[in-house]
Amino acid sequence: MSETLTRVYLFIGPPGSGKGTLSNLLVREYGWAQLSTGNLCRKHISEQTEIGKQIDLAIKSGKLVSDSLVNAMVEQWFAEVVNQTSNIILDGYPRTVVQAQAFDAFLTKLPTPVDLWVIRFGISDQAVIERIAGRLMCQNKECQKVYSAIGQSHLAPKSPMICDACGSVLGRRNDDAGALISERLSAYHKHEQDLIDFYKKQNYRIIEINVEMPFDAVFTHFRELMRLREV
């Protein structure tokens, strides 16, 4: 275990709020570890691990991946990286109070305590819908970098529909279709306040940041709140 206390940042925000964008920048600039449950699920499926086989079966059967399976996957990942970094971002986990309770219990069993911060991304549904409508993703499963089709955006690719990082073609995510966006927002709001209430009762730090600002301003504000050095 590292000598310094590991700080865990739990990003809570709707799809399209910029959690992944901020996470990726913090990984690149500061070397933090990032957990994206979506990417981790895809990794387990592609590697045909035991967890991956169960996730794949659930998805192909049209079922939701169970909380117990998600928890097992996350706990395995966390146990592997907690000794390697002082800062860990949780992006997309926990999504429900059941998952939060399980993860909280898991943290209490670690040899050394961690410092958990809850970061709530403040953004309107309308702003989310506009962002997702212009979202592009690298189609290379090993990359999956996110871009924006809006030319003035800081996320616009240098070459139209081509990934800056790996040169693969960009496309839209299947779940970014208009009707599905509304469904995903509804699902998010169903659990959001319950999660916040849970962490308040546990006396964790909860910080809200306005992510409707330009991304550079969001990053600067986050860096100031966390007292991070400028890089």
Write out the residue ranges for each language-model feature:
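Glycine-rich phosphate-binding loop of ATP-dependent small-molecule kinases
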Residues: 1-231
